[in-house]
Amino acid sequence: MNKHQKPVLTGQRFKTRKRDEKEKFEPTVFRDTLVQGLNEAGDDLEAVAKFLDSTGSRLDYRRYADTLFDILVAGSMLAPGGTRIDDGDKTKMTNHCVFSANEDHETIRNYAQVFNKLIRRYKYLEKAFEDEMKKLLLFLKAFSETEQTKLAMLSGILLGNGTLPATILTSLFTDSLVKEGIAASFAVKLFKAWMAEKDANSVTSSLRKANLDKRLLELFPVNRQSVDHFAKYFTDAGLKELSDFLRVQQSLGTRKELQKELQERLSQECPIKEVVLYVKEEMKRNDLPETAVIGLLWTCIMNAVEWNKKEELVAEQALKHLKQYAPLLAVFSSQGQSELILLQKVQEYCYDNIHFMKAFQKIVVLFYKADVLSEEAILKWYKEAHVAKGKSVFLDQMKKFVEWLQNAEEESESEGEGN
């Protein structure tokens, strides 16, 4: 081989890298190419999807992602605020976009499929599309009512199929959208579309993951941020599941605060009369039923003590402690359902804390003697309302006492008949 001759790799063709092949487009040229292609594809969304798929190899989607999504949604490039840049020149706009589509769920779902295919093909567009949707939600005031509706439907469908994360909804908490009622109106349409794709549990789960479950009231102005107003607004719109969800969330928040305050008062050994008064006021203020409070009281009472680690001593310690707080529990176990909840809580506690396993029957008898639990509640728990935890152990413990209750009941009935 000639020493000056450079080796050649035969059979190898050197290709220009794809990113170097892309044509150098300005945004306006990018727009014109996109508008022309969409107009040629027309209402055939399969043709639109194919055009977008193939054109991505020569158009710089990465650089002009905002222009791409502006045109697919609004038919035109959008200026800051949401106005159309080319509003006066119809040649630079297309009617084959989401805003010009028919206002029905199936049509918008077909458009959603175009976005799904595009983002699956060009994964790098995922974040750009998320940013675009956040931006479009900020621009809602610039869009007509029907355009807002279509955007809400598109957003709901894309949230339902997982193309978009629920975090896009943070744009709706913007003051101007909230004050003018646009945020709440848009949210209702969006949630309807979302729940047409997924069930309520899926929707609420997504809201929790995005930490939006506690912010739903912020869709309304400050003077209307009440659970009652939200519940009426969303129930009237056919979204009772979301109303119920918010009530539960608010109730959970209230219960946590109540439990924290109760724990504090018990640790300070506040008089029982004061604790009763406080709990009743909180129940009234937050519309909490007795059934929601009795379990909290039990938890707080049991957390207020450093328990002995010796099984033979803990029962005596527990009975002494619970005898002190029996009058408190008696006030909030005036209903049969509350009594059953308390019994189940005691059962679960004794099972979860092994040193209390043998103390269950003694605690129940104490509560019976202190008028916290009625014989009807104890018998119902024994026959059908017990939970699975430690079931055989606790039923066996209670057998003799239950037999005594049944015999006492029979004697009482026979005496009544004799009279």
From Swiss-Prot:
One of its GO terms (biological process) is regulation of translational initiation. Residues 1-22 are annotated as: Disordered. Transmembrane segments: none annotated. Residues 248-415 form the W2 domain. Gene3D superfamilies: 1.25.40.180. The modification N6-acetyllysine is found at residue 117. It is found in: Cytoplasm. The modification Phosphoserine is found at residues 412, 414. InterPro entries: ARM-type_fold, eIF5-mimic_regulator, W2_BZW1/2, W2_domain. The keyword Phosphoprotein applies. Translation initiation regulator which represses non-AUG initiated translation and repeat-associated non-AUG (RAN) initiated translation by acting as a competitive inhibitor of eukaryotic translation initiation factor 5 (EIF5) function. Increases the accuracy of translation initiation by impeding EIF5-dependent translation from non-AUG codons by competing with it for interaction with EIF2S2 within the 43S pre-initiation complex (PIC) in an EIF3C-binding dependent manner. This is eIF5-mimic protein 1.
